[in-house]
């Protein structure tokens, strides 16, 4: 699945795609000749590789295959270049260790960071703007990490808000939201924030982000997703009165100590993360808002 995605990335951005170097091992003779103008100690020159040598890609197999597939669809890409780091092959064991080292020590950017820096993706950029325009989020969102440290003044994570917003409009990220859907997302979070008492206390400066994270579930990414799921159903069933329905959020006990969240968002006093728990939490929110569970959602409930 990664190869088609990388291939499409190349084809959709032929002028400004970005790749890191490939890494390969060569099991034959290699000879480096410095450029004449740089003398014998020059670091720039030509690398000669015996064509009978075997080349093993230690890092970049998916990129290499995606480039091959992209060239089939757009031969004009044939003039493009990619840098390659070559190592002398010291045997299978060494190549395997190199593969392990390269992949084990690679640092994968967080989902929040991908959203923050993805200027091509319209939804990502919309979410970045959203957290600066909705009062409860403004200045209280961790933009780079998917978790929040104990001392942080942030209450929410960027990826949590993004995921919950997608659930609200029933979308996967592959389809872009319309302008009307973007307006709905913004309006929804504004209405939700007005109906969660602790969020209002945070806006008023009468409590802190750390206190909310410590004592309540509603800043947690999983709970945000549940609020998004519930919102999608509430709006679908009450297109003209959903704002009134959301006033019932005031009646919910959002504290971690509440039995409502046990085995849904909380297990033995600790927040837990799994898809079933998010759906089960959404069921609580729906029922507290006076919405009957559908047959499918009741089946989820019955498994608890």
Question: Where are the model-predicted features located?
Answer:
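Accessory terminal alpha-helical modules
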Residues: 1-304
